[in-house]
């Protein structure tokens, strides 16, 4: 029974060989497998570490190259993109404003002459005039007119008032006096009738009607003169 319990399907059991060496062989196989796996893991780790280190080493170089490329590119520099603003001195500004009040548009020779006088370039003078014209148009309200237009309109508004106050006497050509004394009254009466007819037939709005002898009443220096109807002709 003891021999039957030791029987198995292994080669050693069939050949009746001792089974003591079976465990050391398994240990040797395990030992041989462990170094192989360890070597494989070390190789993989070294590969990944070398790739990471190489990436870390090359990243500063890449960043420096990118920085140099950005510096060399013309559109990346903010100082180059931003236009340099021209600062005018007080004397230059006063002269430009004085010339702008005289003349808002300059020709090319005038622009060059003014730029030479102020030690500027013609382009700077041209841009200053353009900006000043734009500011003037933008700051002007729609209802505000030019100073010349305002003066002309004030003169037009003031003209009717002056016409109302100033009365110009109309001189009527008198006929030569006759030798008869009767001609004195007959020559003056038709004149008064004509003046009265003109005053009533042609009324002017805003003007007051004056009588035949009231025109001289506006001028104190001529009040001592009598109306034409009262003058007697002595020949």
UniProtKB/Swiss-Prot annotation:
Subcellular localization, as worded in the UniProt entry: Nucleus
Biased composition (Basic and acidic residues): 69-80
Ranges for region Disordered: 51-86
SMART domains assigned to the protein according to its UniProt record, in alphabetical order: HOX
CDD domains documented for this protein: homeodomain
Top-rank taxon, per record: Eukaryota
Keyword Nucleus: yes
GO MF: DNA-binding transcription activator activity, RNA polymerase II-specific; RNA polymerase II cis-regulatory region sequence-specific DNA binding
Entry keyword annotation includes Nuclease: no
Biased composition (Polar residues): 51-67
GO biological process: axonogenesis; epithelial cell proliferation; lung development; negative regulation of epithelial cell proliferation; respiratory tube development; transcription by RNA polymerase II
Tissue and organ distribution: Prominent expression in ventral brain and neural tube structures.
Gene Ontology annotations for the cellular component aspect, listed alphabetically: nucleus
Ranges annotated as DNA-binding: 81-140
Keyword entries, A-Z: Developmental protein, DNA-binding, Homeobox, Nucleus
Free-text function comment from the UniProt entry: Possible role in the specification of a distinct subset of neurons.
Similarity section: Belongs to the NK-2 homeobox family.
Protein name: Homeobox protein Nkx-2.8
Native source species: Mus musculus
Species lineage: Eukaryota, Metazoa, Chordata, Craniata, Vertebrata
